[in-house]
């Protein structure tokens, strides 16, 4: 009985962790959503760091497509 309960608890823990990972990933926005909401710059916009660009590519002070 104890082994069965331990196994069930272990399985339940794994299911909960997987569920939390799925929820976290589903909350991530697409590049288009981030751009539309003004969270990052589109191509050919002036930038000072890669994190500002939706493409994460800031080259020669401009966001590049890739």
Curated annotation (Swiss-Prot):
Disulfide bonds join 40-54, 47-58, 53-63. Residues 1-9 form the signal peptide. Expressed by the venom duct. GO terms for molecular function: ion channel inhibitor activity; toxin activity. It is found in: Secreted. It comes from the Eukaryota. Its main location: secreted. Keywords: Disulfide bond, Knottin, Neurotoxin, Secreted, Signal, Toxin. Residues 10-38 form a propeptide. InterPro entries: Conotoxin. GO terms for cellular component: extracellular region. The presence of a 'disulfide through disulfide knot' structurally defines this protein as a knottin. The cysteine framework is VI/VII (C-C-CC-C-C). Belongs to the conotoxin O2 superfamily. This is Conotoxin TsMEKL-03.
